[in-house]
């Protein structure tokens, strides 16, 4: 296949494969979270050392989004996706072979950068979507991506406990290598929307950031939600082991509860069309805030009640976060369609800076204040995101009243 014009039947299959590719690639940056106790035992890491693995992976993802994702507006997306796939497969294999902390941290950073192929896939799906179905198509691919984020913990937790953390990374490397071949075979070549040199392309990213206040607020709000999300998932496995003597497979099992939220991605897109993207971001941020705040009730419950409450909260905050993310994407993509790659880069730079901060702050607060400290961080940052969206709504309403 070498054209960018697809029949509807073929397009559906290609979009399905893209959803799988997005899920598997983004999963690469989350496999470590339920495996941290196993890695720590194997490599003799402190809690702070374990926390640096997801922190650097998320930081690498943020760097890759900011500095590599804009290339999608300059070069053929198929080539970018395949090259990143090959690099990611090699890095995952290298991670499985590492024997000391410094090489593990370096490879974790590079895995994050290569895994940004997931964010090349999302705009590619929008381009390949049939006329009038871009929202639904992006929602489908985002469902794959979000399921990859959440189910990655379940898979890695089970595989890690049964076979060891190194085997999990070897299986991940094999799956990405297969995807690289499939993507090369099925994807068309994509039109290039810019002939800017790389330095000019990056300057245009700065221009877009300055030009659109709505973009800045979207990145900031989603970034604060991401701090909450990452702080929870980065410390959950350690907390379950220390307080309940539960292994990594149980920590991964909570990903199944969170996966229910990922299924809301297409629904959130439709809701944004009816209520407006801004309204959906408010509802999503409110749900995240309430879901984390509920976990302050844990001391009043027995052990089983506490574990159930964690699962219920995970469903709630994942549902809210993913709904807010899809609505923010709809909002940002509409600002300047010819610059989707760069706009996506800016939005997700905010997201994954938040993820990296959440991992780092979560680990530090868990060491200093335990699980209540992590929940306090998550609740406060989610509330800040809600305040940003409510302030945006108030600003818009005031502007409408002045103009009427």
Where are these regions (language model features)?
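Juxtamembrane intracellular "pre-TM" segments in multi-pass secondary transporters
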Residues: 2-8, 187-220
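Conserved MFS/SLC helix-loop-helix module at the cytosolic interface between two early adjacent transmembrane helices
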Residues: 63-101
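Helix-to-loop junctions at the C-terminal end of transmembrane segments
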Residues: 65-76, 264-277, 366
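Helix-loop-helix hairpin linking two adjacent transmembrane segments in secondary transporters
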Residues: 103, 140-187
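Cytoplasmic helix-loop-helix junction between adjacent transmembrane helices
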Residues: 107-145
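Intracellular juxtamembrane helix-capping segments at the cytosolic ends
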Residues: 117-129, 321-336
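C-terminal transmembrane helical hairpin of 12-TM major facilitator-type secondary transporters
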Residues: 279-327
């Amino acid at each position: 296949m070498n054209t960018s014009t697809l029949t509807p039947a073929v397009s559906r299959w290609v979009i399905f494969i893209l959803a799988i590719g997005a899920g598997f690639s983004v999963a690469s940056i989350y496999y470590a979270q339920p495996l941290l106790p196993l890695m720590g035992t194997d490599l003799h890491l402190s809690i702070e050392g374990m926390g640096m693995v997801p922190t650097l992976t998320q930081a690498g993802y943020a760097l890759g989004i900011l500095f590599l994702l804009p290339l999608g507006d300059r070069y053929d997306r198929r080539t970018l996706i395949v090259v990143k796939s090959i690099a990611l497969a090699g890095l995952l294999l290298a991670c499985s072979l590492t024997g000391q902390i410094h090489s593990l941290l370096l490879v974790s950073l590079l895995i994050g950068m290569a895994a940004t192929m997931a964010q090349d896939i999302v705009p590619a799906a929008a381009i390949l979507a049939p006329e009038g179905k871009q929202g639904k198509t992006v929602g489908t691919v985002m469902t794959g991506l979000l399921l990859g984020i959440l189910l990655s913990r379940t898979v890695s937790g089970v595989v890690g406990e049964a076979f060891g953390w190194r085997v999990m990374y070897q299986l991940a490397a094999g799956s990405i290598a297969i995807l690289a071949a499939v993507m090369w075979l099925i994807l068309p070549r994509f039109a290039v929307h810019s002939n800017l040199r790389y330095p000019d392309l990056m300057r245009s990213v700065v221009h877009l950031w300055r030009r659109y206040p709505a973009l800045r607020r979207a990145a900031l709000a989603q970034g604060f939600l991401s701090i909450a999300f990452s702080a929870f998932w980065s410390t959950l496995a350690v907390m379950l082991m220390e307080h309940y003597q539960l292994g990594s497979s149980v920590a991964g099992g909570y990903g199944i509860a969170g996966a229910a939220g990922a299924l809301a991605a297409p629904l959130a897109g439709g809701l944004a069309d009816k209520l407006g993207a801004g309204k959906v971001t408010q509802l999503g941020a409110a749900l995240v805030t309430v879901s984390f705040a509920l976990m302050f009730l844990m001391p009043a419950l027995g052990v089983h009640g506490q574990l159930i409450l964690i699962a219920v909260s995970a469903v709630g905050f994942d549902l809210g976060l993913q709904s807010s993310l899809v609505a923010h994407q709809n909002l940002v993509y509409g600002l300047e369609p010819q610059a989707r790659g760069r706009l996506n880069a800016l939005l997700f730079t905010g997201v994954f800076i938040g993820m990296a901060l959440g991992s780092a702050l979560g680990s530090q607060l868990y060491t200093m204040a335990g699980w209540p400290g992590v929940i306090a961080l998550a609740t406060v940052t989610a509330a800040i995101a809600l305040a940003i969206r409510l302030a945006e709504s108030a600003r818009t309403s005031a502007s409408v009243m002045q103009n009427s």
